[in-house]
Amino acid sequence: MFTLFQGKWQVSVKAGLAALICSLSTVSLQAAERVGDFALLDQDGFFHHMGWYDDHKAIAFLVQVNGSPQTAEAVASYAALQSRFDAQGIEFMMINPLGQSRASVKQAAMDLDVEVPVLIDDAQVISKAMGIDKSGEAFLYDPRSFEVIFRGPVAALETALNEVAAGKSVSTPVVAMSGADVSYQMNTSISYVNDVAPILAENCATCHRDGGIAPFALDSHAMVQGWSPMIREVLMTKRMPPGQIDPHVGNFTNDYVLSVEEQQTLIGWIESGSLKDGESDPLASLTWPSTKWAYGEPDLIVKVPPQEIPATGVLDYITVMVPFAGLDRDRWVRASQYIAGDRTVLHHTLNAVIAPGTRPSAASFLGGGDPNAAFITPYIPGAEPHLEKPNTGGLLKAGSMLGLQLHYTTTGKATTDASEIGVWFYPDDQVPAERRSGQCACIFPDSWTNIPPYDPNFEQTQSITIQRDAHLLSFIPHMHFRGKNMRFAAHYPDGSVEQLINIANYNYNWQLDYQLAEPKLVPAGTKIVVTAAFDNSTQNKANPDAAREVPWGQQSWDEMFFGQVYWKYVDQNTLVSSTAQ
């Protein structure tokens, strides 16, 4: 049974043919309706945020459906319009409203000889908001007002494009057309208690609570309802949950991507009025641990020397050496957690465990070095405490020091950062049998290429080679304000290539350690190739200075390229035996 859901009402075929015709007319003849800002990934996994295109006069969309005759018939005319209007401030794309598989959409685009991005609406919430209901239809979207300003057949699009290019309003914003219907799966009865609150509790409330790192709490229906317009916006633009990666590449325990069903539930509930059902409020009854430590009271707490941070100015990186006070014997480390004293000024740290009689090395600060040595987690925005895999750990020798490189930013208010690091050990009689290894695919000043001024998509590449059979565990990207995206790919000895992770919308504020759900076996000689793009354009709202040629540098207005990879060697005997010597 076909159903159509729009706003707070639903029409069914069973309700009468006349009502259905009326409803379809309402949808088809609406334009200049505010959709809102949004972002989607295309058939190649690239991220497109509509707000980024606000220097354009409009964005043109052609509704693409695999195997649709209407799409195929419209492509040639659409491409001809692109060749004419692309230089006049019109961006051309397609949109797949059915959320069809990326591989099939990519193949369909190749078959049609399409060279424009095809945005894939997995959850169908964007297409629904735009009012898309027919394949092969053309739309014009204003990236400043976030409105649909034209919809109709491609044959009628030319007139609208001429008007928009000339700075005029579209005289005929809606032109009726026929075509294959686009249908949507709708949840007609969404419960706050049973459907919405559990999603928020699982994905949002840990940060959005009293004392959490988020700026407001989502601890009741009233709070959620009050913030619901903002929640809809950040879901549609993929700003939240933070740190999202491409869900179509790899399988990660912390990809921070809501499922299609979860997105549909939240946005559908908000668009239905954010109503509450039942007497209870699950969010109001959530409880949180009384301790700030993730795994109970640590076995050892390292006090980082307090740092006085002025209100303004540029601060050099601060390097300190901190003893593991109270460590009276060698211990195997199971977990660690860095708690910032003032997270408004501490941006990140680099850590290195320095054993007695040794000197710190660059590799040890960059996640490499001796795999037998203990790993003490650094502070990274949004990062979780580090817990080793079962039966895995490194040795922290008595008398060791912790080298810390601290990066602070000023906020206009003087403050003191007094951070703490919690460390948890294995029992003395339990020696973990496996070690974690790692290496950074990094670009340093000697091989860095300066980013040209105003370049919106400047790419650089670095690689590392894993010399023995190994199981990949996790990946960490690091760039600065101009970082746009970063991709890790495995180039195998047999010549095949596999994408491992796609951080499609890199955000300097969220640099996470993305953990594979299952370790991935790669053979000896596998090359991990990391490709990163930088956006040095004026459209990058975080860009300090688009006119500048950007060098490598430690400060945020310069740039870096770190692609950290962690793995375990399949043969652990050499590593373990070297520890025993």
Q: Where does each model-flagged region fall?
A:
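Structural microenvironment flanking redox-active thiols in thiol-disulfide oxidoreductases
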Residues: Q70-L112, L119-A129
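A short beta-strand-turn-helix
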Residues: F38-I59, S189-D195
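Thiol/selenol-based redox catalytic cores and closely related redox-interacting motifs
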Residues: D121-S183
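Short active-site neighborhood of thiol/selenol oxidoreductases, capturing the structured segment around
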Residues: Y53-A72
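Aromatic- and Gly/Pro-enriched helix-to-coil junctions and flexible linker segments
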Residues: V174-L327, R331, I339, H348, ...
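Structural micro-motif
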Residues: G36, A58, V114-P117, I132-F139, ...
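Beta-strand-centric surfaces of beta-sandwich/beta-rich domains
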Residues: P242, P247-F252, P282-W332, Q337-H471, ...
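Bacterial N-terminal signal peptides
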Residues: K14-T26
